[in-house]
């Protein structure tokens, strides 16, 4: 009803509505966590039964009953990537490293180590273990990924394409979040 197309492109009305909902939900929220150890402890101890998380935490949880679900509304996510500084002294070496880490075997090993979907899905067909990992993290499920909005820093230029309104900035989000947590 608010016309939100991208959760990282909220105008003031949309941000205000989101903050109002979060404040309303404070009565049913057990805790907000900001670090992985606190989150794993909360799930493992039974204090938390549902929440947003990083996929890697499932790998380290003592109880293997942590599962991932994708809400019908979609979810947020992020992509890890290598970046090359404009001031790097060894550009060719940097690009060679990026080429190497993008190969199916290396990218897949990184994905398995960190508990995430590989970017190079050629990895999935390399072994039964690789395919099981790709299945667990929906690596080849295009419909799944269409519902995941990649993380981006909120800025005033709306990244969802709207031109008739100013979106809210990261600082505005930070200030609003402080009112939720108290």
State what each model feature region is.
Residues 19-23, 40, 44, 52, ...:
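Non-transmembrane alpha-helical segments in soluble domains
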Residues 76, 85-151:
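Mature extracytoplasmic/periplasmic domains
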Residues 1-3, 79-83:
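Periplasmic solute-binding protein
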Residues 1, 7-69:
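Ligand-binding pocket segment of bilobal, Venus flytrap-like solute-binding proteins
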Residues 69-77:
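Venus flytrap/periplasmic-binding-protein-like
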Residues 146-182:
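Conserved C-terminal helix/tail region of periplasmic/extracytoplasmic solute-binding proteins
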Residues 2-10, 87-94:
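Short helix-loop capping/hinge motifs at secondary-structure junctions, enriched
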């Amino acid at each position: 009803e608010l016309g939100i197309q991208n959760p990282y492109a909220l105008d003031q009305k949309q941000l205000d509505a989101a903050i109002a909902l979060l404040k309303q939900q404070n009565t049913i929220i057990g805790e907000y966590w900001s670090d992985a150890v606190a989150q794993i402890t909360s799930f493992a101890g039974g204090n938390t039964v549902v929440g947003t998380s990083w996929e890697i935490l499932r790998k380290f949880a003592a109880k293997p009953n942590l599962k991932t679900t994708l809400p019908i509304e979609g979810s947020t996510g992020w992509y890890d990537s290598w970046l090359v500084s404009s001031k790097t002294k060894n550009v060719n070496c940097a690009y060679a490293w990026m080429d190497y880490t993008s190969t199916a075997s290396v990218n897949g090993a990184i994905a398995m180590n960190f508990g995430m979907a590989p970017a190079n899905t050629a990895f999935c067909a390399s072994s039964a273990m690789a395919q099981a990992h790709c299945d667990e993290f929906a690596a080849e499920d295009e419909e799944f990924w269409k519902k995941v909005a990649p993380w981006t820093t909120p800025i005033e230029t709306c990244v969802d394409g709207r031109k008739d309104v100013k979106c809210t900035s990261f600082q505005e989000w930070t200030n609003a979040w402080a009112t939720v947590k108290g």
